């Protein structure tokens, strides 16, 4: 029996995601043995959240050195360009991409009183929350999901904003008070999606992964990530994007670029054929840059 090693971070969420993937792989390839190997990343060791690839670099290095054969990532953690020698082999069916609100007393973001404290780990969420509710106080909230839920329970925050997908994958959907409307708070490009990464030229690993590939999810995140790449903003700027694929093959993409304080933002949308997902993302980025996005990025830098 052939053995395939699947690498992942060691957090509860990363392991839940990877176990889900491995179970699907086992169903499709029962003659193959899949082993999970956890890898500690710089992000797990407290690296600055303003660095790129802090949750993936060590896993990618293990892939390149052949310690593992497949890497399972949260797609939003991946830089928009793959390292030399690696490729994304598969994007499985995407989980809910939206952000969600969990409150201490208030059960909706709009019901929080002025001056209430909201916790989030993301400059994108912070900027969009402040754009909606400039009367709120938004503070950093980091750590794993359990740590963030404990901070809410301890009364350190009046509410917190997280990704829906993580809570759902951890069977914590019942903790969600409100799904935030993407018309007001756009998620991160690729949020809710997983990426299965392999070495270029490893046809076996690529074939194994491709069995889980979900083309509509792939086209959606491809457009969103192209928008991010076209802005040249990196994965840590206040950028949101969300694409939808209609039954007739039309892809609709909406994107936003904000200043960190949420006082200025440019939001735009585009649509076209799903086969042009990447071009649509790049075109939308050019549109946002021409509408004043360059000035916003200059402020951020």
Curated annotation (Swiss-Prot):
Catalyses which reaction(s): 4 porphobilinogen + H2O = hydroxymethylbilane + 4 NH4(+)
Note on how the cofactor is bound: Binds 1 dipyrromethane group covalently.
GO molecular function: hydroxymethylbilane synthase activity
Keywords tagged on the record: Porphyrin biosynthesis, Transferase
InterPro entries given in the database record: HemC, Porphobilin_deaminase_cofac_BS, Porphobilin_deaminase_N, Porphobilinogen_deaminase_C, Porphobilinogen_deaminase_C_sf
Domain of life: Bacteria
Cofactor: dipyrromethane
Top-level EC class as recorded in UniProt: transferase
S-(dipyrrolylmethanemethyl)cysteine: residues carrying this PTM: 235
A biological-process GO annotation: protoporphyrinogen IX biosynthetic process
Pathway: Porphyrin-containing compound metabolism; protoporphyrin-IX biosynthesis; coproporphyrinogen-III from 5-aminolevulinate: step 2/4
Further facts: The porphobilinogen subunits are added to the dipyrromethane group.
HAMAP family reported in the protein's UniProt record: Porphobil_deam
Role played: Tetrapolymerization of the monopyrrole PBG into the hydroxymethylbilane pre-uroporphyrinogen in several discrete steps.
Protein name: Porphobilinogen deaminase
Gene assigned in the entry: hemC
């Amino acid at each position: 029996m052939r053995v395939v090693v699947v690498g992942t971070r060691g957090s509860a969420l990363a392991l839940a995601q990877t176990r889900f993937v491995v179970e699907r792989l086992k169903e499709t390839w029962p003659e193959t043995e899949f082993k999970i190997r956890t890898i500690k990343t710089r992000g797990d060791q407290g690296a600055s959240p303003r660095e790129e690839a802090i949750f993936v670099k060590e896993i990618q290095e293990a892939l390149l050195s052949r310690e593992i054969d497949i890497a399972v990532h949260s797609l939003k953690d991946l830089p928009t360009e793959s390292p030399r020698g690696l490729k994304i082999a598969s994007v499985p069916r995407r989980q809910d991409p939206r952000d969600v609100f969990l409150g201490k007393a208030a059960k909706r973001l709009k019901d929080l009183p002025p001056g209430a404290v909201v916790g989030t780990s993301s400059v994108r969420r912070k900027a969009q929350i402040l754009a909606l509710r400039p009367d709120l106080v938004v503070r950093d909230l980091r750590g794993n999901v359990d740590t963030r839920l404990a901070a809410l329970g301890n009364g350190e925050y009046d509410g917190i904003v997280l990704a829906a997908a993580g809570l759902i994958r951890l069977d914590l959907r019942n903790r969600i008070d409100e799904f935030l409307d993407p018309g007001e708070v756009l998620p991160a490009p690729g949020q809710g999606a997983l990426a299965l990464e392999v070495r270029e030229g490893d046809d076996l690993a690529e074939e194994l992964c491709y069995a889980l590939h979900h083309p509509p999810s792939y086209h959606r995140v491809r457009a969103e990530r192209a928008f991010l790449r076209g802005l040249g903003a990196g994965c840590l700027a206040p950028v949101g994007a969300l694409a939808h694929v209609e039954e007739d093959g039309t892809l609709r993409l909406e994107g936003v670029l904000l200043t960190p304080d949420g006082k200025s933002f440019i939001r735009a949308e585009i649509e076209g054929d799903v086969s042009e997902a990447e071009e649509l993302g790049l075109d939308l980025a050019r549109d946002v840059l021409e509408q004043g996005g360059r000035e916003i990025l200059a402020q951020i830098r």
